[in-house]
């Protein structure tokens, strides 16, 4: 008997709890429905809970409430409200609002100044070094270098060089190192094309070079061509080593396994 009573009370308690949960789910939220005491929109002033923007407390179409098209409210098209297109509100396109489109607010406006565009001349100038020079048969122009300090064996030439070194080139023309069998061929070709181009360009501007200038220019350009060859050779061998490393079977298998783990 005791067990049967206990079971009955447990059943009754379970049914009561289930019914209470069902009622809680069906119970309407306060002030959330249409035409109820609450409002569906935040920031409305009336307790009537209409469906339109912030109003002053009257019903629809009244002169002093907050209804549609009224002179004293917060609705659409009013002169003293917060509706759309008004002169003294916070709506769209107003001169005295806060946050609307094109207003005097500080955030979210569409009339911000556009960002300055990148000057393409600066981009082209930055990409000039190391690029293939048109009209020179595949020669490239190296980066600017400091002109080396060279001693020519006598005071006159040393002084002449120091006084005129600014007239000599600080960049050299060259072809890729893989087109030459050794450093001497690279340097000889580099010196010839660089001195020729610099002489022609400078002569066109009305400045002539003497035999002493040509002699010193060849010595200066030779040193710069040697430096250019060493730089290009090191970069070439590094690229070749990278290709060999990533083409080896163990590395290929490792990369394939990592890709399989990421994709899978």
Curated annotation (Swiss-Prot):
InterPro entries hit by this protein: Prion, Prion/Doppel_b-ribbon_dom_sf, Prion/Doppel_prot_b-ribbon_dom, Prion_copper_b_octapeptide, Prion_N
Region (6 X 8 AA tandem repeats of P-H-G-G-G-W-G-Q) location: 54-103
Localization per record: Cell membrane; Golgi apparatus
GO cellular component: Golgi apparatus; plasma membrane; side of membrane
Top-level taxon of origin: Eukaryota
The protein's name: Major prion protein
Similarity section: Belongs to the prion family.
Residues binding Cu(2+) 3: 88-90
Region: Interaction with GRB2, ERI3 and SYN1, residue numbers: 25-241
Lipid-bearing positions (GPI-anchor amidated alanine): 241
Sequence ranges of the Sequence repeats: 54-62, 63-70, 71-78, 79-86, 87-94, 95-103
Stretches the record annotates as Disordered: 28-118
The protein's assembly and partners: Monomer and homodimer. Has a tendency to aggregate into amyloid fibrils containing a cross-beta spine, formed by a steric zipper of superposed beta-strands. Soluble oligomers may represent an intermediate stage on the path to fibril formation. Copper binding may promote oligomerization. Interacts with GRB2, APP, ERI3/PRNPIP and SYN1. Mislocalized cytosolically exposed PrP interacts with MGRN1; this interaction alters MGRN1 subcellular location and causes lysosomal enlargement. Interacts with KIAA1191.
Chain residues in the propeptide: 242-264
Pfam families attached to this UniProt entry: Prion (PF00377), Prion_bPrPp (PF11587), Prion_octapep (PF03991)
GO terms of biological process kind: protein homooligomerization
Glycosylation sites: 192, 208
UniProt-listed SUPFAM superfamilies: Prion-like
Domain notes: The normal, monomeric form has a mainly alpha-helical structure. The disease-associated, protease-resistant form forms amyloid fibrils containing a cross-beta spine, formed by a steric zipper of superposed beta-strands. Disease mutations may favor intermolecular contacts via short beta strands, and may thereby trigger oligomerization. Contains an N-terminal region composed of octamer repeats. At low copper concentrations, the sidechains of His residues from three or four repeats contribute to the binding of a single copper ion. Alternatively, a copper ion can be bound by interaction with the sidechain and backbone amide nitrogen of a single His residue. The observed copper binding stoichiometry suggests that two repeat regions cooperate to stabilize the binding of a single copper ion. At higher copper concentrations, each octamer can bind one copper ion by interactions with the His sidechain and Gly backbone atoms.
Binding site for Cu(2+) 1: 72-74
């Amino acid at each position: 008997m005791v067990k049967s009573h206990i079971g009955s009370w447990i059943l009754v308690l379970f049914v009561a709890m289930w019914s209470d949960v069902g009622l809680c789910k069906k119970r309407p939220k306060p002030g959330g429905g249409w035409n109820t005491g609450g409002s569906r929109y935040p920031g409305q002033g009336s307790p009537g809970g209409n469906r339109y923007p912030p109003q002053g407390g009257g019903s629809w179409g009244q002169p002093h409430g907050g209804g549609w098209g009224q002179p004293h409210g917060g609705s659409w098209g009013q002169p003293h409200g917060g509706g759309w297109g008004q002169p003294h509100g916070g709506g769209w396109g107003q001169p005295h609002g806060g946050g609307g489109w094109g207003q005097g607010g500080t955030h979210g406006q569409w009339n911000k100044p556009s960002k300055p565009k990148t000057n393409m001349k600066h981009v082209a100038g930055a990409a000039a070094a190391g690029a293939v020079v048109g009209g020179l048969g595949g020669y490239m122009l190296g980066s600017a270098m400091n002109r080396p300090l060279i001693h020519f064996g006598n005071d006159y030439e040393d002084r002449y060089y120091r006084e005129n070194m600014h007239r000599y080139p600080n960049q050299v023309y060259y072809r890729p190192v893989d087109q030459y069998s050794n450093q001497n061929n690279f340097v000889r070709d580099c010196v010839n094309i660089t001195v020729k181009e610099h002489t022609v360009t400078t002569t066109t501007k009305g400045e002539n070079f003497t035999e002493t200038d040509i002699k010193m220019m060849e010595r200066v350009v030779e040193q710069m061509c040697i430096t250019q060859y060493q730089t290009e050779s090191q970069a070439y061998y590094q690229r070749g080593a990278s290709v060999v490393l990533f083409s080896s079977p163990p590395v290929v298998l490792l990369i394939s396994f990592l890709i399989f783990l990421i994709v899978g």
